[in-house]
Amino acid sequence: MDHIKDLLQFLDNSPVNFLATETICQRLVDAGFERLNACEKLDNIKPGRQFFFTKNDSSVYAFRIGSEPLSEAGFHVICAHCDSPTFRIKPNAEMTGEGGIVRLNTEVYGGPILSTWFDRPLTIAGRVIVRSEDVMCPITKLLQVRRPLLQISNLAIHFNRQVNDGVKLSKQKDVLPILGIINNELEKGNLLVNLICEELNIEQKDILDFDLY
């Protein structure tokens, strides 16, 4: 039972690859692994020690140096991916339709079963690149909104009579999530950015880019 709870906690803290990477790194540190900077000279690699490093904030490479010669003991490799099918939010994503309904322009990431995403509460997670005092070294901030924000809604059946017969879904039209409703022009184009600023306690002018899902 403890293993199941641990797995569920890991999944809850790792909705996208960036957050999964952070969670894995913390677990490695807790297990006695040492973090390496892959851009620096590695001169402390010795038998019996264990290390890890990351790439692009989205993948982790961990290894343990054995005490036996490599030619005699060989080595073991275990690989897994930490991303999963989802929807990636495009830049300038807000699309305002009739009645002020705001949807987010997204692209399908991976191979999701589209029908399973309808009529359920969804949220946003990923990373935001933020301006720092050093123009050449922006800061990466991880974002995980732990409350419902979005929904991909089915049409009522009298607007889609064939829904129970199997309807082909358009990835460009039918699965764009609804973010909210705006009441005036001042809100237009700012809902998502304002949400990011509120969650991360940053200024809009400092946002350089984001990878959000």
Question: Which ranges hold each PLM region?
Answer:
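N-terminal hydrophobic/helix-forming segments and targeting peptides
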Residues: M1-Y213
